[in-house]
Amino acid sequence: MKSSLLAALTLASCVVPGSVFAEEGATTYRVTFERTWSEDTHPADFPLLAHFSPVIGATHGRDYALFSEGATASAGVERLCEEGKHQPLDAEIRAQIESGRVGALIETMEPIRSVPGSAQTRVSVDAGHPMVSIAAMIAPSPDWCAVAAGVSLMEDGRFVAEKTVELYAWDVGTDAATSYRALDADTKPHVPEMRSRSPYFLRDGASVPVGRVIFVRE
């Protein structure tokens, strides 16, 4: 009896009151990537045939960033945001899956041409890869993408039931052109990625979202 009581007291002393243990295993989210970017929301010089490219992203931990303000765009990010193509970014993400820094590749296959419009997919996250970074090219444009970077789906050690994150236009620093349909003007060397400060995406000095991404736990 004494040994059982001692074991129970020892266990209790190791638990910090109010602490929450991180969930183990994987959980699935329905991901809806919505476009709101339109002539009504962003009227300045709004282009004909405007659309978002198919969506690409990754689940990951804190030691990985698909997009990061101040970082230099990879070859894959450059091609996504200049041409709307997933290659070679998909290969870059798969290489990080092999290294363990990324949990899963996220992709949709069709552009988002209508407003309102959306693309939907499902993704699995786990305690080691509880974050999502996801993007689509804003097309036409020099090197601009609609981005949600480093969205954590785990709060206080628990996976959230639902989360909505605004999508903002990013300039990934690979093309110096400043208008939607400008000719290519490659930036060499590349300048750091940042949320776009183009007047196309500002109102009264503040960034206007181009969409949102909604995560719903299944």
Where in this protein do the model-derived segments appear?
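A ubiquitous, low-specificity "background" feature that marks scattered single residues
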Residues: 8-9, 177
